[in-house]
Amino acid sequence: MNLYNLSDTIVFKILRDIDFGYLEIINFDGAILKFGNPNDSLKANIKIKKQNFTFNLIKGGSISFAESYMKDEFETDNLSNLIEITARNIKIIHKFSGLLDLQ
């Protein structure tokens, strides 16, 4: 298992615990992952375009997330909803966000 696969495993396992909203992720390898309640009115999606996306989240947290968006390493149909889902599930997100930030 390489580092990127390991980071995918960590992030996606933690995302299973989100309480608010519904998040659909199309991973770099084409796998479709679904988290949260599909009946929730708050929905967002992420299409990951670079294999190192989840590793960067673990390494650099929200700064890396913003940088990845600016570098077009992922895309979403609704950035506002994605940010709201992240904010409403911040206790879950913080379990992996910036986990490897050594600064």
Identify the residue ranges that each predicted region occupies.
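Feature captures hydrophobic
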Residues: 1-103
